[in-house]
Amino acid sequence: MGDPRRLGKKYDTPNHPWIGERIQSEKEISQKYGLVNKKELWKMETQLRNYRRQARKLISDTTTQGGKEAVQLFNVLKRYAILVESEPTLDHVLSLNIESILERRLQTIVYRKGLAKTAKQARQFIVHGHIAVNGKRVTAPAYLVSVAENDAIEYVPNSPMASENHPERTAAVSEENQ
């Protein structure tokens, strides 16, 4: 059978580990979006870097194939609402920042919809299996939510959180109403 292949890393670490400005900005972003460690942030930064790298490559490509690839890139970014312009250009892709991707994580959307009081509580609800997307339980806080799935985020029906009078749920709803 052979050994299974070794999977490569899905992120790149910073070139220089001890730059104070970068550390401070990473800390602020981690607190704002409830990230547990820097690796989660680096994964999203690498994903953004790959989108931008592809856009830079496509700017110089004037063939019909380059046009098709640009349309495919726009479709992917629109599907996840990372790119919201109606007539996107490659310059729009180059102007994306890390927060545009972090806003599409399931953890952030659960918090923004008011299903949890904090981003960290949203993460806990997801990891513990209280959140469903399109009726399927999702336990990955970094799951990127597409536009089609945006309205289908809810509590799992057989979860204790689905009860209207659960203490944590009523606290989140009452704080949202104030």
From Swiss-Prot:
GO MF term (any one): structural constituent of ribosome
Record's keyword annotation contains DNA damage: no
TM annotation in the entry: none
Residue ranges of domain S4 RNA-binding in the record: 104-166
Region (Disordered): 158-178
InterPro entries with a match to the protein in the record: Ribosomal_uS4, Ribosomal_uS4_arc, Ribosomal_uS4_CS, Ribosomal_uS4_euk/arc, Ribosomal_uS4_N, S4_RNA-bd, S4_RNA-bd_sf
GO annotation terms (biological process): ribosomal small subunit biogenesis; translation
Alphabetized Gene3D superfamilies for the sequence: RNA-binding S4 domain
Family matches, as SMART domains: Ribosomal_S4, S4
Tree of life domain: Archaea
One GO CC term on file: small ribosomal subunit
Subunit description: Part of the 30S ribosomal subunit. Contacts protein S5. The interaction surface between S4 and S5 is involved in control of translational fidelity.
Family: Belongs to the universal ribosomal protein uS4 family.
UniProt-listed HAMAP family: Ribosomal_uS4_A
Task of the protein: One of the primary rRNA binding proteins, it binds directly to 16S rRNA where it nucleates assembly of the body of the 30S subunit. With S5 and S12 plays an important role in translational accuracy.
Protein name: Small ribosomal subunit protein uS4
Gene this chain is encoded by: rps4
